[in-house]
């Protein structure tokens, strides 16, 4: 009897381990059913940040801007009162320096002509007016600019004056009319250079003479 029961149990166990496709399919179906029970979540829809619409009231108009003339940002020059007790001025056309008449023995057209010759600038004198040949500028940024200067000496009973004005101005060989800013700069630069060079040379002569006397 026990043997019969044991055989029956063995048969049931073997039946559970059967490789029958139908049996396996039933097992797989039960697994799929358990998988469908897993919940699925959809993305959370949020309203986000609502930005205000752009207001065109202060928008810049979309227009084509034409380039204007180049602006000269270099600092201007003025005539300097290098001579003792002198007065300087730019009158819109000329730079001038007025000084005591006794100083005219140093600051005069003859000295100016000699100085220009040393710089390689030729000139002609007609009475109290000296006219230079074309002279290149030494201003940084200038391109092929040349100037003809007119230098005049004016004398009264008490004072003497030197004035510098622009007679002609050209760039790359083409003559053009300088504006007031150019006139002020270039006439002041030329007058200051003349007076400073003559003053420096005169002071050097005095120092050399003083050294000779001491020895």
UniProtKB/Swiss-Prot annotation:
Lipid addition sites, N-palmitoyl cysteine: 17
Keyword Signal in record: yes
GO terms for cellular component: cell outer membrane
Pfam family, one: Lipoprotein_18
S-diacylglycerol cysteine: lipidated positions: 17
Keywords of this entry: Cell outer membrane, Lipoprotein, Membrane, Palmitate, Signal
Signal peptide: 1-16
Alphabetical list of InterPro entries matching this protein: NlpB/DapX
Membrane topology: Lipid-anchor
Cellular compartments annotated: Cell outer membrane
Protein family: Belongs to the BamC family.
Name of this protein: Outer membrane protein assembly factor BamC homolog
Source organism of the structure: Haemophilus influenzae (strain ATCC 51907 / DSM 11121 / KW20 / Rd)
């Amino acid at each position: 009897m026990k043997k019969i029961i044991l055989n029956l149990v063995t048969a049931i166990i073997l039946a559970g381990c059967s490789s029958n496709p139908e049996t396996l399919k039933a097992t797989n179906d039960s697994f799929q059913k358990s998988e469908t029970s897993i919940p699925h979540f959809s993305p959370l829809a949020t309203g986000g940040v609502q930005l205000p619409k752009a207001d065109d009231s202060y928008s810049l108009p979309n227009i084509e801007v034409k380039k204007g003339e180049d602006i000269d940002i270099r600092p201007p020059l003025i005539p300097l009162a290098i001579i003792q007790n002198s007065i300087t001025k730019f009158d819109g056309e000329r730079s001038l320096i007025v000084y005591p008449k006794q100083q005219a023995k140093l600051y005069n057209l003859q000295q100016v002509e000699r100085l220009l010759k040393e710089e390689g600038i030729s000139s002609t004198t007609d009475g109290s007016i000296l006219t230079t040949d074309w002279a290149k500028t030494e201003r940084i940024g200038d391109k092929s600019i040349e100037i003809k200067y007119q230098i005049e000496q004016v004398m009264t009973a008490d004072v003497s004056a030197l004035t510098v004005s622009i007679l002609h101005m050209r760039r790359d060989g083409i003559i053009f009319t300088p504006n007031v800013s150019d006139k002020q700069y270039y006439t002041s630069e030329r007058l200051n250079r003349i007076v400073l060079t003559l003053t420096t040379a005169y002071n050097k002569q005095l120092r050399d003479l003083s050294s000779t006397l001491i020895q």
